[in-house]
Structures are given as structure tokens and as C-alpha cells.
């Protein structure tokens, strides 16, 4: 079997690809490596700023839609699997679908249906709304952009032609279930345990190492700024009993190396489900 994974989200598809390969499946992963995260990928696809960067990116996606053919499965990491407007995404979606087998979707990150569920009060609270009150993120163009008519039409089209989908978090599952029904399976977040080998701690210091991993651009969304403040207060109160290891915007391998020294890992603030806590 040949599987084509297009796009990645915080190493999710890279971990999935690693396990599929261990099971003898031929996998090709196209992504930008998560930018500074530098996650595994087979084909590097990234958009640089400016008009020239846009033209080069459009050319690269077009060439990939010509060359990546004959796969049994094409799985997109999100409806926005490339950094393009909805009408261009639909064009390339149709090309990949025509030249390959089944079309599948990973529900990871925001899309029209998830943001609509947040806006419609499906969740008691979300990064966009708490009850009827908009949060800081809910007052941004990012929030309203997901609800634009062209985004809605494109997402409805994509969901309508899918052969199946997997949800990475329960909230994504809740938002998409009314539309996809039995085509949707909750799979959770793939984790490549080969990258997380057991390691002995050096406990000679006797202090507890508190680890906080951050993406600076997602600090507001994930609440890591709040966590940092709380953890720092704890360290200031008991400097002889604990220390804070904070990392931000580093490669995934550096992240793993730093995390191995941690006794307690706090990657993000609790959200609607335990999956994000």
C-alpha cells in the first residue's frame, strides 16, 4: 500500500508516517517540517514571504500535484493543507483526488466546522468564546476568517467528498461528527515512542525539574504564558526544591533532549478536554 500524507501539525503526521513504515507501508510525507521544529518529511514544501515567494510556492504545489500520483491513500492534515486561498485549495484537491485513490482528512487544527462549533456554543468554553463572551482570539480576523463564505463552501465541498477522516482531539471529533458521521474515527494524537526512550535521571541535585515547552506564537491560544507565570512563582517561592526549564521555538530533537531532564512536563494549559492538558 502507498500512502501520501500532505502537511503536518506539530509532528502528528511524521509520527503517523513512522509507525506506518514500521508496518511495511510505503509512505511519502510532504510538509514544511513545522518550520523551526524541523520535523521529519520526505518532500519539503514551504512558502516564503512576498509575491515571488507566492509564485514559487504555487509552482511547487502544481508540480507536486503532477508528480505525486498512484497512491492508494491521500491524507490531508487539515482542509488548509497548503498555504493557499480556498479556490486554489479546491483546484489542487481535485487534482490529487483524480490522480490517486481514497481521500482522507486528519482533523488537526482549526477549520470551518470547528470554529463554527465554538461560535455556536457547542462548547461551554473555547479559545474563541467563554459562554457568550468573545475572548481576545475571538475578536481577531483569524476567528472571523474561518467563518467566511468562501471558506465555508470549500470546507463543505471537501467534507462531502471524503472517504474517511480521523480526529486528533475529542473537540475536533465533536465538531465534525454531525457532518461526517460514521466516516469519522477518533484516533487521538500519534506519538512515536521510539523517540521517547526511557532515560535514568541524575538526581544528585534533588531539585524537581519543571519543564515548559512553548510556541511563542501560540502562547495566548495554549495558555503557556499563564503557565510560565505560575511555574516561575513556584520556583521563586522554593528555589531550593525546584527549577524551571523553559524552551520555545526550537527543533523537535532539541525539544526531546531538553525534556529528558524533566520530572514534570507542562506543555499547555487545560482546554476543553484532557487531550490538551
Where are these regions (language model features)?
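Short N-terminal targeting/anchoring amphipathic segment
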Residues: 2-6, 65-88, 102-106, 266-267
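A conserved mid-protein helix/loop that constitutes part of the nucleotide-sugar donor-binding site
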Residues: 11-15, 218-233
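N-terminal subdomain of nucleotide-sugar transferases
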Residues: 1-43, 98-101
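Acceptor-binding helix/loop patch of EC 2.4 sugar-transfer enzymes
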Residues: 39-42, 105-149
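A short, active-site helix/loop in glycosyltransferases that binds the activated sugar's phosphate group
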Residues: 114-115, 142-184, 229, 233
Amino acid at each position: 500500500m502507498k500512502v501520501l500524507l500532505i502537511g503536518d501539525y506539530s509532528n502528528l503526521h511524521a509520527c503517523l508516517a513512522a509507525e506506518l513504515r514500521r508496518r511495511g507501508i510505503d509512505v511519502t510525507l510532504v510538509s514544511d517540517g513545522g518550520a523551526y521544529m524541523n520535523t521529519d518529511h520526505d518532500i519539503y514544501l514551504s512558502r516564503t514571504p512576498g509575491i515571488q515567494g507566492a509564485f514559487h510556492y504555487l509552482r511547487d504545489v502544481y508540480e507536486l500535484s503532477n508528480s505525486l500520483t498512484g497512491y492508494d491513500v491521500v491524507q490531508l492534515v487539515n482542509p488548509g493543507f497548503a498555504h493557499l486561498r480556498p479556490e486554489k485549495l479546491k483546484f489542487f484537491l481535485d487534482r490529487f483526488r483524480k490522480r490517486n485513490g481514497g481521500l482522507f482528512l486528519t482533523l488537526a487544527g482549526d477549520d470551518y466546522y470547528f470554529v463554527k462549533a465554538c461560535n455556536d456554543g457547542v462548547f461551554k468554553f473555547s479559545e474563541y468564546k467563554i459562554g457568550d463572551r468573545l475572548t481576545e482570539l475571538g475578536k481577531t480576523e483569524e476567528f472571523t476568517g474561518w467563518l467566511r463564505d468562501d471558506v465555508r463552501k470549500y470546507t463543505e465541498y471537501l467534507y462531502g467528498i471524503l472517504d474517511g477522516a480521523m480526529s486528533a482531539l475529542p473537540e475536533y471529533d465533536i465538531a465534525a461528527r454531525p457532518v461526517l458521521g460514521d466516516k469519522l474515527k477518533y484516533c487521538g494524537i500519534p506519538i512515536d515512542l521510539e523517540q521517547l526512550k526511557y532515560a535514568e535521571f541524575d538526581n544528585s541535585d534533588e531539585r524537581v525539574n519543571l519543564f515548559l515547552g512553548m510556541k511563542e506564537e501560540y502562547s495566548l491560544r495554549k495558555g503557556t504564558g499563564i503557565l510560565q507565570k505560575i511555574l516561575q512563582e513556584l520556583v521563586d517561592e522554593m528555589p531550593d526544591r525546584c527549577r524551571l526549564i523553559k524552551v520555545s521555538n526550537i527543533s523537535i530533537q532539541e525539544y526531546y533532549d531538553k525534556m529528558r531532564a524533566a520530572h514534570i512536563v507542562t506543555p499547555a494549559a487545560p482546554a476543553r478536554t484532557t487531550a490538551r492538558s
